[in-house]
UniProtKB/Swiss-Prot annotation:
Directly interacts with BCL2; this interaction prevents the formation of the anti-apoptotic BAX-BCL2 complex. This is G0/G1 switch protein 2. One of its GO terms (biological process) is positive regulation of cold-induced thermogenesis. It comes from Mus musculus. Promotes apoptosis by binding to BCL2, hence preventing the formation of protective BCL2-BAX heterodimers.
Amino acid sequence: MESVQELIPLAKEMMAQKPRGKLVKLYVLGSVLALFGVVLGLVETVCSPFTAASRLRDQEAAVVELREACEQQSLHKQALLAGGKAQEATLCSRALSLRQHAS
């Protein structure tokens, strides 16, 4: 608030001294840049909840994908183990059947 109160006397003093064109252009440029910064700050403040929500959704989606990948890996491992056990059982039954025929 202090800076706004200081700007009004500064503007009055500048107008009383009849400033040169370059100085006025410089002050106008500074004012426009300051106003642009304020607008960007307001836009960022207004939009920040939406970006935080989208980040949270992205993180949740990544967690779900990781869980699905882990489940698929465990199912694949179980399938391999079950397939290996079935093959062993087949080989054992064949061996037993061969023994029965041989005797």
